[in-house]
Each structure stands twice: as C-alpha cells, then as structure tokens.
From Swiss-Prot:
Keyword list, A-Z: ATP-binding, Coenzyme A biosynthesis, Cytoplasm, Kinase, Nucleotide-binding, Transferase
One family name in Pfam for this protein: CoaE
Entry-linked Gene3D superfamilies: P-loop containing nucleotide triphosphate hydrolases
Uppermost EC category: transferase
Record GO biological process: coenzyme A biosynthetic process
Domain DPCK stretches: 3-200
Protein name: Dephospho-CoA kinase
UniProt-listed Enzyme Commission number(s): 2.7.1.24
Locations listed in the record: Cytoplasm
Gene: coaE
Amino acid sequence: MLRVGLTGGIGAGKSEVSRLLVEHGAVLIDADRIAREVVAPGTPGLAAVVAAFGEDVLAEDGSLDRPKLGSIVFADPEKLAVLNGIVHPLVRERSTALEEAAAEDAVVVHDVPLLTENGLAPLYDLVVVVDAAPATQLDRLMRLRGMTEQDARARMAAQATREQRREIADVVVDNDVPLEELRRRVEEVWDELVRGAHTE
C-alpha cells in the first residue's frame, strides 16, 4: 500500500485532481467530506461544536450553518484552533478505519486540505501538492464558489503559503493549465504512484 497525502490551497483544484486519481483506481479518503460527516445532525461532533460556539451556528433544520461558523472561525485563529481540535481527531479516527479496509497493493490518497498547516507530511509515503497562482485561486473562489473577495482572501490567508506547501511536496501538480493538460499530468503522477505502491 502506498499512502499519499494530497493537498493544495483552497481553490487550487485539488478536488479535480483527486477525482482524476480515483478514475485511475486510487482509493480516496477525503478529509473534507469526512469532516462534514462527523458534524452531521445527531453526531457527538456537532454537539461539541454547538457547545463551543453556541446554537447560533445551527441552521433552522438543525444542521451546521457552515457559512456562519466559517465567518466566526476564519476571522479568529484561536476559534479556528478550537474547531480543529474538535473535528480533526474525529476525522483521523474515520480515515484510519477506511485505510485499514483498503487492499494491500492499493494507492490510498488522503485528500487533506490542511496537511501543511498541521505538519502531517511525515505520515505519508509521498506528498502531492496541487498548485495554482493566488490570482487563479481567488478567481475560482469568487466565480465558482460565490465568495466575496474579502471572504476568499481571508480563507487563503488562514492557510499555509504557496511556498510552504511546495517545500513539503514530493510531487507538484501545476493546475494553472487547461483540463486536458491537467489530465496528462495526473496520468504521469498516477504511473509514478503505482510503481511506488508495488515497491513498498
């Protein structure tokens, strides 16, 4: 088994790269998706978030109001640390269970947005960083996710710098390119990962 850490700044196009890797046969463990699951209505995770931040972070249907919580934590590093302290241990536990269920020769790709920030690179056999220019990230966040420029810049500023991410990368996937070019690059990376999985 080859354990791959996949990361990249918000709006860099990490989801597209992970989707292409899954098409090739990777087992994907998506930390963002798991992070949503562990704070779904009725979970201990959501109860802990409400205990820390108050009932104002709940939507009318009892689910987590993500934009509301985001506006609180992304403007305050201490509050962000509190949220991460609740969610990250739950995500780790679920990720471990999914990895243990994968085949011995699998390429297991952990899609981890805050891999750099949390110093998680040593946990993986290989780190793949999806990279895009800050202007590209900003454009995608405003155009595709409907964020205001201020919100988008705050999210970007709360993450590691482009240089910090590239520093921990074993492989960099440049995503300032057209989709076809990205596909070709991901195919090259996949071939490298498969070779790695069979020599582990």
